[in-house]
Regions:
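Oxidoreductase cofactor-interface core, primarily capturing Rossmann-like NAD(P)-dependent enzymes
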Residues: 2-32, 38-45, 65, 86-88, ...
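NAD(P)H-binding glycine-rich loop region in Rossmannoid oxidoreductase-like domains
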Residues: 37-104, 116-121
Length: 171
């Protein structure tokens, strides 16, 4: 069964890699009907590259919850890979996207968090620690029968790209 997948923050490193992988890896490609990329920067170079691969690039406009819900419904998103943007308003933008996923009744949502966020101290590393609050808000939908999103939410903690890049250089 092929799925329509929506990936957020495709203008960033992680979002770009996820969308690219879905359309280029044979294991995933055969199970994907289409990929939509939500982005704060639709004219970014990474968005142009993804568009060449077949990703439908859609601008994400924070503060317009109803519009975001409609967008998710219009593209027919059956699965959402929710990646917080590298943005000063990351927390608010992500909270709004969590709510949009619920209202759009997307049954399969994967929240991509940051490895090590549980070890961060709230006072010393507030940006990293905020991922814990976002994870909690996202997982609060689990078991919520008023939305399909409550069926199977999942959190994946991914190492920040710069850490992974540094790690690979030492190999």
């Amino acid at each position: 069964m092929s799925r329509t997948v929506c990936v957020t923050s495709v203008d960033g490193h992680t979002g770009f890699l996820v969308a690219e992988l879905l359309l280029t890896n044979e294991t995933f490609k055969s199970n994907i009907k289409s990929v939509t990329g939500l982005t704060l920067h639709p004219h970014a170079e990474k968005c142009k590259e993804l568009a060449k691969l077949g990703v439908k690039i859609v601008p994400h406009e924070p503060g317009r919850l109803k519009h975001t819900v409609q967008t998710l419904q219009q593209v027919g998103a059956e699965a959402l890979c929710l990646i917080p943007p590298a943005h000063k308003d990351k927390f608010d933008i992500t909270m709004e996207m969590i709510e949009a996923a619920k209202q759009a009744n997307i049954a399969n949502v994967c929240f991509v968090s940051s490895a090590g966020c549980d070890l961060a101290e709230r006072d010393k590393q507030p940006h990293l620690r905020s991922f814990i609050d976002l994870e909690a808000a996202f997982m609060a939908s689990k078991g919520d029968s008023s939305t399909s999103t409550g069926h199977s939410p999942v959190v994946v903690r991914y190492p920040p790209p710069f850490l992974m890049s540094n790690f690979l250089k030492w190999q």
